[in-house]
UniProtKB/Swiss-Prot annotation:
SUPFAM superfamilies, per the entry: EF-G C-terminal domain-like (SSF54980), P-loop containing nucleoside triphosphate hydrolases (SSF52540), Translation proteins (SSF50447)
GO molecular function, one term: GTPase activity
NCBIfam families in UniProt: lepA, small_GTP
Binding site for GTP: 14-19, 131-134
Catalytic activity: GTP + H2O = GDP + phosphate + H(+)
A GO cellular component entry from the record: plasma membrane
GO terms classed as biological process: positive regulation of translation
Organism whose genome encodes this protein: Cupriavidus pinatubonensis (strain JMP 134 / LMG 1197) (Cupriavidus necator (strain JMP 134))
Enzyme class at the top of the EC tree: hydrolase
InterPro entries, per database record: EF-4, EFG_III/V, EFG_V-like, EFTu-like_2, G_TR_CS, LepA_C_sf, LepA_CTD, LepA_IV
Cellular location(s): Cell inner membrane
Protein name stated in the entry: Elongation factor 4
The keyword Ligase appears for this protein: no
Gene behind the chain: lepA
């Protein structure tokens, strides 16, 4: 036990977490130089391209230290993005230590801090590391100062290294061995193993990544999953080095994988506890919670006959992503599709991108919405995740919307513009503090404002320097209304949005104006209206195309011309009664791009 160290690496996007992991694996001989490639632990293409880590991965390494002893290092790679914060907290609770990687040229950023606080709350020993010291603009002294000011941990002896060139990586491992305590646990006690992650393998079913806290797990054991109460027979156990290697057993303190012939990912929930029968553990490990989707959007196939293919693709994605929810939905404008729930905006983008990329789907996506709670007059509570399902306003007592606490970090010259942005988004300031040249702002902002375009706007007002993370706080009553878009007085359900009343007039006008540019001219006039309930708040017209019916007249009597024009008018009127307006794909995207004033 004394020679085991379980650790993970915490860092903001692009601070060099995966590269450092690569170097540590290489140094410990986990992979030969031939098998080594950049970002070994990021197994999805999209992870490598966006430079983010989505799923947790592990590597069990052996390292011969300078004191001559051989240590077993278990590296648990964590996702860094706020959407996956639950996965981060599970990965961290499986560790005793965490390397806090800070880019020496950029200093501390929001997600570093968010994950670092999670680590400190879980009682994990944090070891600061300064990366990218080979860069000419690196400023280690300033970075150390920021770590001490912002996070409040002692960083005077932070290890400098450069993951890219490999310089100082050994010192990082030595510091890790010196500062991180070995795991505690009793190998002879009843089994308690924490599921850090799980994914689906086509050959063996669900593979669970576990950290054994107490006890020993062997093949042929009867495993019991405590959250669901399901029983399975363990088929094989082993470790990743990062290639999978089978072992005879996993004992307390170790991290490895378990295969137990589970067919559905839903059965192996991240954060659940595995124990064995007949000697089962008294209680599960703390910290398990069901992950709830926060952002909803409709996904529709462009071709109606692709509906089944889309269902299959979503099913396949769900095999590897238990937090993705979906249910069938019908829209008059878009036909059959699915209402999908995501953890956050990044999660939504990734799912869309994987559907388009890995499954070749052409998709129409509706505007993302959040979940509202509606207090009805008769005292019942309804949750609404789709604007089209909002009950009749006359039956509603109050609408509650989700509020999130947002932490923003930025250089002080951008504070003014970031505060302006937060105020536009109906935010209320909670706190503001200066750390050297960095400023930390804390705001409470309605989640609906964040899912629209907050992140993009934040990056543009701060020239890319601001970083943010957010967490759900509570539901609060709010004066929000549903704005419907009518085309030739037919409601287009997929274009409905829920907005704050103060912004509804502007929003309605803008959307109508945008639609007018996008809808192609028809053979008859098309009226585009925005309405709240039965109140029309904006209207735009798309003028009809018409043939010049007088071209063949040359002079001639006025009554002849009138007759031709009247005839044309009557024809257009008939057309309008039977015609339907095709709404192009861009119209649905246009809704997303309406800037707030």
């Amino acid at each position: 036990m004394d020679h085991i160290r379980n650790f993970s690496i915490i860092a903001h996007i692009d601070h060099g977490k995966s590269t450092l992991a690569d170097r540590i694996i290489q140094l410990c001989g986990g992979l030969s130089d031939r098998e080594m490639e950049a970002q070994v632990l990021d197994s999805m293409d999209i992870e490598k391209e966006r430079g983010i880590t989505i799923k947790a991965q592990t590597a069990a390494l052996t390292y011969k230290a300078r004191d001559g002893k051989v240590y077993n290092l278990n590296l648990i790679d964590t996702p860094g993005h706020v959407d996956f914060s639950y996965e981060v907290s599970r990965s961290l609770s499986a560790c005793e230590g965490a390397l806090l990687v800070v880019d020496a040229s950029q200093g501390v950023e929001a997600q570093t801090v968010a994950n670092c606080y999670t680590a400190i709350e879980l009682g994990v020993e944090v070891v600061p590391v300064l990366n990218k010291i080979d860069l000419p603009q690196a400023d280690p002294a300033n970075a150390i100062q920021e770590i001490e000011d912002v996070i409040g941990i002692d960083a005077h002896d932070a290890t400098p290294c450069s993951a890219k060139t490999g310089q100082g990586v050994e010192d990082v491992i030595e510091a890790l061995i010196a500062k991180v305590p070995p795991p505690k646990g009793d190998a002879s006690a009843p089994l308690q193993a924490l599921i850090i992650d799980s994914w689906f393998d086509n050959y063996v079913g669900v593979v669970m990544l576990v950290r054994v806290v107490n006890g020993t797990l062997r093949p042929k054991d009867k495993a019991l999953l405590m959250a669901t109460g399901a029983q399975h027979l363990v088929e094989q156990v082993g470790v990743f080095s990062p290639k999978s290697v089978q072992r005879d057993s996993l004992t307390a303190g170790q991290v490895g994988f378990v295969i137990a012939g589970i067919k559905e990912l839903k059965a192996a929930k991240v954060g659940d506890t595995i124990t064995t029968l007949p000697r089962k553990a008294e209680a599960p490990l703390p910290g398990f919670k069901e992950v709830k989707p926060q952002v909803f959007a409709g996904l529709y196939p462009v071709e109606a006959n692709q509906y089944e293919a889309l269902r299959e693709s979503l099913e396949k994605l769900r095999l590897n992503d238990a937090s993705l929810m979906f249910e069938p939905e019908v829209s008059q404008a878009l036909g059959f599709g699915f209402r999908c729930g995501f953890l956050g905006l990044l999660h939504m983008e990734i799912v869309q991108e994987r559907l388009e990329r890995e499954f070749d789907m052409d998709l129409i996506t509706t505007a993302p919405t959040v979940v509202y709670q509606v207090q009805m007059r008769d005292g019942t509570m309804v949750t609404v995740e789709n604007p089209a399902k909002m009950p009749d306003p006359s039956r509603i007592e109050a609408i509650l919307e989700p509020i999130v606490t947002v932490n923003l970090y930025m250089p002080q010259e951008y504070v003014g513009s970031v505060i302006t942005l937060c105020t536009q988004k109906r935010g209320s300031q909670i706190n503001m503090s200066y750390h050297g040249k960095q400023v930390q702002l804390t705001y409470e902002i309605p989640m609906a404002e964040i899912v629209m375009d907050f992140f993009d706007r934040l990056k543009s007002v701060s020239r890319g320097y601001a970083s943010m993370d957010y967490e759900f706080k509570e539901y609060r009553p709010s004066d929000v209304v549903k704005v419907d878009i009518l085309i030739n007085s037919d409601k287009v359900d997929a274009l409905s949005v829920i907005v704050h009343r103060s912004n509804s007039q502007y929003r309605g006008r803008e959307v109508a104006a945008k639609m007018r540019e996008i809808i192609p001219r028809q053979m008859y006039d098309v009226a585009i209206q925005a309405a709240i309930g039965s109140n029309i708040i904006a209207r735009e017209n798309v003028k009809a195309l018409r043939k010049n019916v007088l071209a063949k007249c040359y002079g001639g009597d006025i009554s002849r011309k009138k007759k031709l024009l009247e005839k044309q008018k009557a024809g257009k009127k008939r057309m309008k009664q039977v015609g339907t307006v095709e709404i192009p794909q861009e119209a649905f995207l246009a809704i997303l791009q309406v800037d707030d004033k």
